[in-house]
Amino acid sequence: MRKVGMLMVTALAASLLAGCGYKASDKKEEVTITVFAAKSLNQVMEELIAEFQKTRENVNVQGSYDSSGTLMVQIEEGADCDVFFSAAIKQMNQLDETDGLVVEGTRHNVVNNQVCVVTYKGSNTKVTGLMDIKNAGSIALADGSVPVGKYTRQAMVNAGMLEKADDVSKISTTDISEALGGVEINECANVGVVTSAVAEGSNEVGTVYYSDTYGLEDRLEILEKIPYDLTGDVIYPVAQIQNSEADEAEATTAKEFVDFLITDDAKEIFQKYYFDTDVED
């Protein structure tokens, strides 16, 4: 009798679950992907991630932000990364053409940015732009492995302020200081550190991206947007990364996120944060 009773209870429970429309497959497991993105993308990426997740309740996109050079090295060393969004083509080329870590067919040029010379509000600086930046009391400058630091060095070379070099990223801040008459230079690990150093008044001027001034309009003054003929285009490429730890659902979601970043909806968000979306893919 006890066995029959148990069978009846089990059958009743099963019928109740069926009546409620319950299916084990209805509850999807959470899918988490990791996106490595340049520090200058921090603000816009948070909104892009939120927008992407709106229609994907089981998806969690985790952003990790630093200089593109630092992130590239982490990926090469085996860090768990599904998508890489770089502030320069150089680092993406390294992962793609040299390391073979980019998933074929997923690489896209997404946005363009512009390097600016900035100062803090009320600084009364005598600097008007790149050509007379030596007149500053101090300069916040990203190191050469950081894209904004490389673009700044390239602009200085093209403007005749620095001697030509086979690899401008190797030009040290000491070399730059000497070329500019001994001005004090604060070497920074990424563009976010440069932005903070100037906005807080720790350094008189610095070079950042136009997008880095978003939300800081009351603290930063743009002295000059450096022309593209000095820096070259500041293209941001994105791609899915070969991740041996990712399962099929994670790999699919990573590809979907890359595809989302080149949609019209994403472009509107990029433009809000001062990025130029008129780029050739």
Regions found by a protein language model. Give the residues of each.
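A short, gly/pro- and small-residue-rich
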Residues: 98-106
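Exported/periplasmic ABC-transporter solute-binding proteins
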Residues: 20-50, 54, 69, 89, ...
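Sec-dependent N-terminal signal peptides of Gram-positive bacterial secreted proteins and lipoproteins
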Residues: 1-24
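Short, high-confidence coil segments that cap the C-terminus of an alpha-helix
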Residues: 58, 80-81, 203
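Short glycine-biased active-site loop of nucleotidyltransferases that positions the nucleotide triphosphate
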Residues: 76-77, 108
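Ligand-binding clamshell of periplasmic/extracellular solute-binding protein-like
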Residues: 63-73, 80-97
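A generic structural motif
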Residues: 56-62
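CheY-like receiver
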Residues: 74-75, 197
